[in-house]
Amino acid sequence: MSESIDIRQLNARIEQQSSFVTNLVIGMNQVIVGQKHLVESLLISLLSDGHILLEGVPGLAKTLAIKTLSQLIDADYSRIQFTPDLLPADVVGTLVYSQKDENFHVKKGPVFANFVLADEINRAPAKVQSALLEAMQEHQVTIGEQTFPLPTPFLVMATQNPIEQEGTYQLPEAQVDRFMLKVVIGYPTLEEEKLIIRQNIKGEHKKVLPVTTAEEILKARAVVEEVYIDEKIEQYIADIVFATRYPEKYGLAELKDLITFGGSPRASISLAKAARAYAFIKRRGYVVPEDVRAVVHDVMRHRIGLSYEAEASNITSEEIISKIVNKVEVP
């Protein structure tokens, strides 16, 4: 009985702390046409303190969505346009010599912001990608002999073009794993496309104002961490991730030759955190299997290595995840 009372109290706190989520969604929808899943995914990454990678062809509002979200939050924002000639110092900062006092001074890079847009991250070579991804992992940056903590909250929202396009450098598996979510952006519907045309030819570019603060985001994250996950849900999450490593143990022997590696423990942690954030968005103080299923593709799609056989057969990680989710027993 006490547990149910606790859940009711938690639901009340979530209702109180999550009011800004509605305002964020309204603000996003004023600028972004459609793309409901994209907006929801950005909110999940924001609430679960997990970096997000958006993939899609140019022109699908990836950059606009991230920029709009940052404008709706009263916090520091910076944009890094990744190009082949970008240097690590252009991202994290460097030491600059001053002739006036004959000393080196630290010049901090654009990574020192609450929200960092890493635009077209796969346009820059590996050493530049590594500079940003190290900052993502450690939440600190070393310039010269000094180490500087990054601001709180610190969230990297990156975009990339599909790897088939020319002039792109594929992110290594170990680095892309640091993104909690990888969201693939699709084309809008016909009706949405017509609305996009109408808004743009009329010059109807709506400006948004901040509706919340960085402090409110941190308070909401503290509540998200209290969202209850039952042992059966923990087992469900672990089973899904284990099925990517040992599919034959879950009656999916046909997947064994299609997977070179499965999700790591980081995948399990990310799946639990994302499911909690999704429950919070739905104003619930506990996680249900539907929450896990709602986020599993975005959490897992970049954490499964496909074999040559899978690629030759045009089998995607999404198909493998769907088969696993359909097979693993739901609590």
Regions found by a protein language model. Give the residues of each.
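Canonical AAA+ ATPase core
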Residues: 98-102, 120, 124, 128, ...
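Conserved C-terminal "switch" segment of AAA+ ATPases
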Residues: 13-18, 31, 168, 182-254, ...
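Walker A/P-loop
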Residues: 46-83
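Pre-Walker A (pre-P-loop) alpha-helix and adjacent loop at the N terminus of AAA/AAA+ ATPase modules
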Residues: 13-60, 242
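Conserved alpha-helical scaffold flanking the Walker A/P-loop in AAA+ ATPase domains
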Residues: 41-44, 97-117
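P-loop (Walker A) phosphate-binding loop of NTP-binding proteins
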Residues: 57, 91, 159
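Walker B catalytic acidic pair
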Residues: 56, 119-120, 131
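C-terminal engagement/docking regions of AAA+ P-loop ATPases
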Residues: 1-8, 14, 247-331
